[in-house]
Structures are given as C-alpha cells and as structure tokens.
Amino acid sequence: MEYNPFHNGHLYHLTSARELVKPDYTIAVMSGNFCQRGEPAVIDKFARAEIALRMGVDVVLELPVVFATQDAGGFAFGAVCVLDATGVVTDVVFGSESNDIEFLQRVARILYEQPDEYQKFLHEELKKGYSFPNARKYALMRYFSMKGWNEEEVLKLEKSNDILGVEYIHSALKIGSNIRFHTIKRVGAEEKDTSFRGRFSSATAIRNLMREKRWEEVRDSLPEDSFEILMREINEGRGPVFLENMGDFLLSFFRLKNMDFFEKIHGFSEGLEKRFHVCARQTGSYRDFLECVKAKRFTFSRIRRLALFSVFEVNKEFVEKSNTKGPQYIRILGFTEKGREILSLMRKKAKLPIVTNMSLYRKVLEKTDLPVDKQLFLEQIDLDVKATNFYSMFFPSVEQRCGERDFSIHPIFLRTEM
C-alpha cells in the first residue's frame, strides 16, 4: 500500500478485506517517503502509518525504498517478500478493477513459467518500440489467442491494480510462498482519474485538490482521522510535499552529471542516459525536462523513478542483488495494542530480523542468526535513511527540515482509548 493519502477507497478495501477473510490481525506493508510512480508522498511515512493504525490496521511495516520505487514487479516482489518473511501472514487481499482472481492467477503463472512462445511474442513486441508494459500486454494477447483463450481478457491489464495484483501472485510463485490471494472490487474513480469524484475520488485527484488548496473536497474524499492528521502535518509545516518542490534541485543535479554517471544507475538503457544528459541542459523546468526525455517507449513513471535512482545513486548491482535476495529486514513503522500481540509472535516466527528501534539496527544485525546478507541489509537500510533525509529537506517549514528522522522518531504506538 501507499496510502498517499489514505482515502475512502482505502478504508473500503480494509473493511471489505476483514469481512472477506476474517483475520485475527491486519498487517499493512507501506511505501516510505517515496512511491512507486517515482514521486514523494504528500506527508511522511510516520504520519501515514499513524493514519493506517487509526483506520484499523494492527501493524504497519515499511517497504524498503529499493522496492517501493521500482516498477510494479519490483514493488510487488518486495511487498510479498516482507509479508511472507513475517511468518504470520496467511492471506493477502488487494484491490482489483476486474475482481477476477482466476484470470490474474493465470497470467501470473505465464509470467512465472515464461513459455517459449510468450518469450518470442514479447521480444517481437519490444522490437516494435513499445514500452515494456505495452509490449507485455500485446505478447499476452497473442499468447492467449494461440491458446484459444479470449485475448480481450488481457485488456484488463491496462488497469493499475490488476497489473499489481498479477505481480503479487507472480512474486509469491517465485519465492514459493503459501500466502493465499484474494481480490476486492475497486470502487470509485480509477487511479489515474484526475477529477474530483466525491467520496471515492482517486489518490491522484486528491493530490491535485491539495495542490489547489480545495480543502473541503479533500475532506469529502478522506476518512475523518485521515483528514485530521493530514491537516496537522500541513499546519506544522511537514507537508504537503510534491514532486514539483524538488524540480529545481533535480534539474540542477542532472546538469552536474555526465553520461558515465547515468550509465551506472539502475534502469538506464536504450539511450536514456543520453536523453537525461541532453535534456537537463536544454530545459529550464523539471516538467519540461520530463517531456523532453519522454518517448513512445518510456513512461513518465519510469523516468521519474530513474530520477530518484540517480539522486540516491542506486546502482544496477544493488538493485539486481535486492531483486534476487529480497528485503533483508522487517521495519516496523507502527502498531496498536492489539498489534503488540502479533509482533510478539513475529519475533518467534519471522524469517528476517525485525527492526523496531532504528538506533539499534546494527545491534539487530550483529545478533541475528537468521540467514541474511549483512552487506545488503546495510545497503538497503542506508538507502531508506538517505531517502528520508532527502525528503525532509522539502518540508514547507525550515524548522522541520532537520535530518535523521528515522532515528529521532520511534514507531507509532496507538493505545486503545478507554
């Protein structure tokens, strides 16, 4: 989840998920301060975790930045690995436009098994110049047609939640997880819908309302507690944070780098390093820079992710290793009194070390006897800290911009009111 911000659709998903699987506890794995579309969250991860707890989540875990800022495949892989590593998660419920779990499982199985015919179709579609998501869609349509299945079904994968759902199931197959997957029909506006649609407006639309300071419409789109905490963060100068706030810095940073620098960064290929190098010098705003880099084959989300990888100097080897070995720790962002119970069980059953107090993460690493890659553990957690330090520099209030928030803020603990 991203909860950027936590809106009525998220509350519907959470409530429906509880009704569907009747869990003893509810755990959410959430992006930190940067999200999968390559953008900053409008308020920071601690405030968003607090909202999730107030809305009924028992434990909020952080998805490490190296996964939270990847494409759908990397994002889903990190999330499923974290949930599986808790040792206590049995079911995952995700929102879906199609609400067709059998179709999503069929596609995930194709992606996992990689039949020769599918690989051939994918290669041919990529050669036509399509972006990877579109090339994969067309390759799947051809594969479905070859099998005598309804190829029009593949058009469901044009929707963001269904794409992510396929990747969740695919990731579980890759790691041999026994987690059961369920879908909840997405309600309200589509994710990319930029218009206000009342109670069930999309997160994209809500962020646009925030840009325009249309607070009454924002209030209508969020649960009461979510709106209350959002406004608290804004009034105290810790939000909202938008990508455009970072634009001048990002463009300046890119102008200082040569193509050799970009070639070492994860995700740069097909001439993108040259496009970054040239466009940074030919444009005067970050918006114009994105338009300059954009081509038929590259999505804006991909370009924004590459921009973040560049600033954080995320190299290819680090991401490849992370995508092979997965997250190396479980970071706790917050929990309720009820959540304490499941945390106690997690400490006995978890497959990865649990980091609750960030000031002690090195001791956690030294003491663990779990099979983790210690160097990768340090690299992943270092990126999380780096991302938080960078993010806080763009708080509206100068007084709030102090660094090391990962160490000064402890996990949110929500007590049950008497």
Curated annotation (Swiss-Prot):
Q: Species name for this entry?
A: Thermotoga maritima (strain ATCC 43589 / DSM 3109 / JCM 10099 / NBRC 100826 / MSB8)
User: One Pfam family for this entry, by name?
Assistant: HIGH_NTase1
Instruction: Tell me the function of this protein.
Output: Catalyzes the formation of N(4)-acetylcytidine (ac(4)C) at the wobble position of elongator tRNA(Met), using acetate and ATP as substrates. First activates an acetate ion to form acetyladenylate (Ac-AMP) and then transfers the acetyl group to tRNA to form ac(4)C34.
Q: What is its main location?
A: cytoplasm
Which chemical reaction does it catalyze?
cytidine(34) in elongator tRNA(Met) + acetate + ATP = N(4)-acetylcytidine(34) in elongator tRNA(Met) + AMP + diphosphate
SUPFAM superfamilies from the entry?
Nucleotidylyl transferase (SSF52374)
Recorded protein name is tRNA(Met) cytidine acetate ligase
An individual GO BP term:
tRNA modification
Which EC class does it fall in? ligase
Q: Which GO terms describe its cellular component?
A: cytoplasm
A molecular function (GO) held by this record is: tRNA binding
Give the matching InterPro entries. Rossmann-like_a/b/a_fold, tRNA(Met)_cyd_acetate_ligase
Q: Which UniProt keywords apply?
A: ATP-binding, Cytoplasm, Ligase, Nucleotide-binding, RNA-binding, tRNA processing, tRNA-binding
The family assignment reads:
Belongs to the TmcAL family.
> Where can this protein be found?
Cytoplasm
